[in-house]
UniProtKB/Swiss-Prot annotation:
Protein name per UniProt: Mannosyl phosphorylinositol ceramide synthase SUR1
Biological role stated in the UniProt entry: Involved in the synthesis of mannosyl phosphorylinositol ceramide. Catalyzes the addition of mannosyl to phosphorylinositol ceramide. Suppressor of RVS161 mutation.
Lineage of origin: Eukaryota, Fungi, Dikarya, Ascomycota, Saccharomycotina
An example Gene Ontology molecular-function term: mannosyltransferase activity
Organism this protein belongs to: Saccharomyces cerevisiae (strain ATCC 204508 / S288c) (Baker's yeast)
GO cellular component assignments: fungal-type vacuole; fungal-type vacuole membrane; Golgi apparatus; mannosyltransferase complex
Enzyme Commission number, as recorded: 2.4.1.370
Length: 382
């Protein structure tokens, strides 16, 4: 096997391993294992007496101010009417800031410097659930039945489409290990991905929470540290569902439309990916052919350390410095220049060029031997 091919294979293996290492959590999201932790029918509608409630009866919601938009008031009121025995807290931006400042000062700098307000709205919900416990509900989610059956689990999230979990409805006991892990991971995932939609999703949104959930499941989960998953049928659109949805996603910017369009054209995205992969492979094949070519071999022979020295000294001399090359370095550079001149001449002529060595008589030099290191360019002789 040619050494060039070995180098190329090793490079591709290292590249592939690096990609797998940095995207492993995203790749694992392709495996839908939410069924293992699903909240079942018998859990929500038990024949026996209901299980004791673990999650505190607190409903948390967030908004910029206390002036909630009109189209969300009906859903909010439904939650209040169905749960008169629950404590209700609407977290405004000012309340969230003061809470982080007083209880989690180590996170205040990150909290203040989030690029998008929705990132702060996402982050605060993890902190309040970890600190107080209870159920967090987005303002665009209206309640359709009592939440009491969901309080029997240490923590719950809801499954989202097509993969992973969402952060619009969540419940937890105080200091649940999953939400503690989420808090500790927020700083690490605070990265700007150039596209607002991906930045929000990956730093604090559902994608972030899904990645943390996958990592958490690889831990040795403590006995009381399980996270149960509310399935889509129990989330909305059925008579037995817990929630209904009104107009939401107020944080979506223009780029979100593109991302949603891509979700609706999965096949086109896959085909585009294959085409892109083909061009990458073709580029690597072209690069390999160049490595194996004579041009590359000549290039590696000519570009020696002495040639680099010549260029470096030339640059310094042009700046006003007066540096001289050693005789051996100068001779090598001259030989390299001569070889390039001969190569250019050979393209235009098939005749022999006579080269004279300073201390020897004239010899006829055959261009095809390309032994330029022993000769200097002279006049033609018969």
């Amino acid at each position: 096997m040619r050494k060039e091919l070995k180098y190329l294979i090793c490079f591709n293996i290292l590249l592939l391993l690096s990609i797998i290492y940095y995207t492993f959590d995203l790749l694992t999201l392709c495996i839908d294992d939410t069924v293992k932790d699903a909240i079942l029918e018998e859990d929500l509608n038990p024949d026996a007496p209901p299980k004791p409630q673990l999650i505190p009866k607190i409903i948390h919601q967030t908004y910029k101010t206390e002036d909630i938009p009109e189209h969300w008031k009906e859903g909010r009121q439904k939650c209040l009417d169905l749960h008169p025995d629950y404590k209700y807290i609407l977290w405004t931006d000012e309340m969230a800031y003061e809470f982080i400042k007083e209880e989690y000062p180590w996170f205040l700098d990150t909290f203040e410097n989030y690029k998008y307000p929705i990132e702060r709205a996402d982050a605060i919900r993890y902190f309040i659930l970890s600190h107080y416990g209870g159920v967090y509900i987005d303002l665009d989610d209206g309640c359709e039945r009592k939440l009491d059956p969901l309080l029997a689990f240490p923590a719950f999230l809801r499954k989202t489409s097509p993969l992973g979990v969402s952060n619009d409805v969540m419940g937890s006991v105080p200091r649940h290990p999953f939400f503690l892990k989420a808090l500790k991971s927020l700083k690490h995932y605070d990265k700007y991905w150039f596209i607002p939609y991906m930045t929000i999703m990956g730093s604090t949104g559902p994608l972030f929470l899904s990645v943390i959930w996958k990592q958490y499941k690889r831990w040795r989960i403590p006995k009381n540290g399980t996270v149960r998953i509310l399935q889509p049928a129990y989330y909305k659109m059925h008579s037995y569902s817990f929630f209904s949805i009104t107009k939401g996603s107020s944080w979506h910017l223009d780029d979100a439309k593109l991302m949603k369009a891509l979700e609706n054209h999965i096949l086109s995205c896959v085909v585009t990916g294959f085409i892109f992969g083909f061009f990458i492979l073709y580029g690597e094949f072209t690069f390999y052919c160049w490595l194996c070519s004579k041009n590359f071999s000549n290039l590696t022979k000519n570009w020696k350390l002495n040639a680099i020295k010549v260029r470096f000294v030339t640059i310094l001399n042009s700046l006003g410095l007066r540096l001289k090359l050693s005789k051996s370095t100068s001779d090598t550079a001259s030989a390299t220049l001569l070889a390039r001149q001969q190569k250019r001449l050979r393209k235009d002529s098939n005749t022999n060029i006579v080269l004279l060595k300073s201390s020897r008589k004239s010899d006829v030099y055959d261009l095809e031997k390309n032994d330029s290191s022993k000769y200097s360019l002279g006049n033609n002789s018969s």
